[in-house]
């Protein structure tokens, strides 16, 4: 049985159950892979209920050999009142109750040579309106081009299994989304990011910046035709299941590199950018706070230790300076020579 929608596509009657089951399985898969990589610490699970409807399970690892702190969350919430952040983007959802489910993850490694990483995949329904969103992005503290290239190549391969224009559009969208306007720099080397993918016969880019590189590229591509709910569900499954392949080889290359106080202090300083982005710009944080989500779970993305320094500038010709000059601006990482 299927339910017709305004996007001239059809949603299976068991859509919510199927997506939630996949996202919980993804949480399990990622946690098991990270526990095996850490070799000692385990995730502690905290289940919670939302009074207005729904709940979730938060899993956090602290003080591991690999992770100083990391969290992998699953949530499934519903309610009658749509948050303003959703209505601003999809006003046609007004007047309907909503359902939202997602798995989100942020890992803050101990060694400054191991990059921080973020993942989120989600699904939303409100009456006739539905869409998938998500992505994954990498935030290194020290510049290793082969790591950025590997992370992008794995996600490009996952995208290409479904459409060859997914990666070029969603890579540009990621560069645009994870950008700190007040700092004039990207959060890291990016990855993929997409939202409002509902299968309608429209351009792939559906973000807020019609003049950006993502929009311009998407306009050149034009419509790729309508896609079914099943097509898009298969796509986010491929992306989610690509994460461990994209991240763990980087971890193994960097986790045993020797570092000192200089590298640690720079890591803590750069973590400040993560805090700034998540509290000022991040759509998931804003949505969670507007829908009375669980604050501890929403703010799980923040690092355990961080510092700010007035007027910091990296030493010329240093590895830190290379991060700023090359790794905090959009690059064609898939084709980067290494």
UniProtKB/Swiss-Prot annotation:
UniProtKB keywords: Chlorophyll biosynthesis, Cytoplasm, Heme biosynthesis, Metal-binding, Oxidoreductase, Porphyrin biosynthesis
EC number, UniProt record: 1.3.3.3
Residue ranges, annotated region (Important for dimerization): 274-309
Binding of a divalent metal cation, residues: 108, 118, 152, 182
Pathway where this protein functions: Porphyrin-containing compound metabolism; protoporphyrin-IX biosynthesis; protoporphyrinogen-IX from coproporphyrinogen-III (O2 route): step 1/1
HAMAP family given in the database record: Coprogen_oxidas
Record's protein name: Oxygen-dependent coproporphyrinogen-III oxidase
